[in-house]
């Protein structure tokens, strides 16, 4: 402001501070709430799998947790996008920009998906939605694809029933999976590959492994 005033008053010919830029603000930590491994297991185990809805919900949550997938990519899957290649089951996701991304299925996610598909009876309908809405009157699946907002309502309800924070959301499971992977010795590079992130900086936003370390350090202040 001062130099601009001096330039206008022709006291100086140029503003020497015009090329100076303040420090760039860089976000180093995401805001998505995460769950501990124990609370994630608590949530999954709390789901009543004696119903089709329960089997669907458990499978959907497992796919997000164990493959770090975005909710849009998960609900966008067709039946054919859970497939066997060699001796392993795989997930195929359509990511942003129309790119396809394939991830081997974790054994828990594979088991939950198999149980869901057998009960739903949709294994042969390869070109149809994998995760579907349910008709309230009959309790049977409709041909309609589950929407991300349907998934969010389900997750909020499941979290409440399990006594977990209502703040968790669809993205929670992506962040939870990445953090748990890193805590158990996984590398940031491999987490990036599984999550299909363009940059490791994006993956790092989901990494909350330092949260516990930071708390331990703060607790050193013994007053």
PLM region spans:
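Conserved catalytic core of the tyrosine transesterase superfamily
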Residues: 1-223
């Amino acid at each position: 402001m001062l130099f601009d005033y001096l330039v206008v008053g022709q006291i100086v010919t140029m503003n020497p501070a015009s090329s100076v830029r303040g420090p760039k603000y860089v976000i180093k930590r995401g805001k998505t709430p995460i769950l501990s491994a124990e609370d994630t297991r608590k949530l999954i185990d709390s789901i009543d799998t004696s119903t089709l809805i329960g089997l669907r919900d458990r499978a959907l949550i497992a796919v997000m947790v164990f493959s770090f997938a975005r909710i849009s990519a998960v609900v966008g899957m067709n039946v054919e996008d859970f497939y066997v290649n060699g001796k392993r089951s795989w997930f195929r996701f359509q990511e942003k920009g129309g790119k396809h991304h394939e991830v081997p299925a974790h054994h828990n996610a594979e088991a939950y998906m198999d149980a869901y598909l057998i009960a739903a009876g949709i294994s042969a309908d390869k070109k149809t939605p994998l995760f579907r809405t349910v008709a309230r009157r009959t309790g049977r699946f409709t041909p309609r694809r589950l929407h991300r907002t349907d998934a969010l309502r389900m997750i909020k309800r499941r979290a409440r029933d399990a006594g977990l924070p209502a703040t968790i959301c669809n993205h929670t499971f992506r962040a939870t999976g990445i953090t748990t992977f890193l805590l158990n010795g996984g590398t940031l590079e491999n987490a990036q590959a599984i999550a299909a992130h363009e940059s490791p900086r994006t993956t790092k936003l989901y990494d909350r492994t330092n949260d516990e370390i930071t708390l331990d350090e703060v607790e050193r202040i013994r007053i």
